[in-house]
Amino acid sequence: MNSILFSITIPAYKSTFLHSCIESVLSQTYQDFELIILNDDSPEDIEKIVSQYSDKRIKYYKNEKNCGAVNVVDNWNKCLSYANGEYIMCIGDDDMLCPTCLEEYTKLISKHPGLDIYHALTQIVDENGNLKRLQEARPEREGIFSMIYGRLRNMREQFIGDWLIRTDYLKANGGYTKYPLAWGSDDMTAYLAAKDKGVANSNVIMFQYRENSRTISTTGDVLIKLESINSFMSDLEKLINDKSLPKDGLERGFQISCQSILSTAEAIKRRGIISDDIASKGKAYRWLWWLINKKQLNVTSSDILKGWAKSLNK
């Protein structure tokens, strides 16, 4: 197999872990890559950190105007526009690649050539780099409905940095799928990339996702989060009911299962937002705000009650 050029992109806003993130890329055992760092007009000194490196594979850009958390996917897609590699990954400024990440991806591509998307096994770490948990193992090959089913049943977690996607495919299909706050953007992007040919998964640990208090998924207005969920679930319903998608007997079984649990999964997501909001803003009165505004928020009394009950354990 010919040498593969990888594009590793970092849409950067936070500086705290950026040095470690860059070092993890430069320390790869496979060295044929470009590192694209896009400063989202951050108030933190991103440029000072990047300027410490003279590696010619690093390409630094800065937005004239901040995309912000709500429109963060715009930043992902701007990174994509700069990419020249055959495959691209988009990682957070606080995440890390394991040393053999790209080497393992070359092995996976060689074993399963011609796909539009590949997946890395991920460790979830805390702010100090301590292991919190390991992402679940996945079958080496699977189709779109198997992927969706695992997420709807809450048996999987995944992040944008888990995925390696063929650059030409992504550019030809509108880039990363945009939802406010990127809620569901990584999932839908992966599903669409796997729609025709499926995905190849590695069960070698290749990526580290860092959970911390400044992660986008922990921020944002509840109205925006609910808007994101509604848009994502609407698109997901269309995808699940797409009769044109190729599917064998197993995939057809997963498709039927996805159709049967979609509404329940959507309700669980809404209740999760309600629960987090009540827990963070006051269990004693916040549930009343939800009841008063339930029509505007398009949630039910049952959603609020179950969200409140869940918040008691937080």
Cite the ranges covered by each PLM segment.
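Conserved nucleotide-sugar donor-binding catalytic segment
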Residues: 8, 142-224
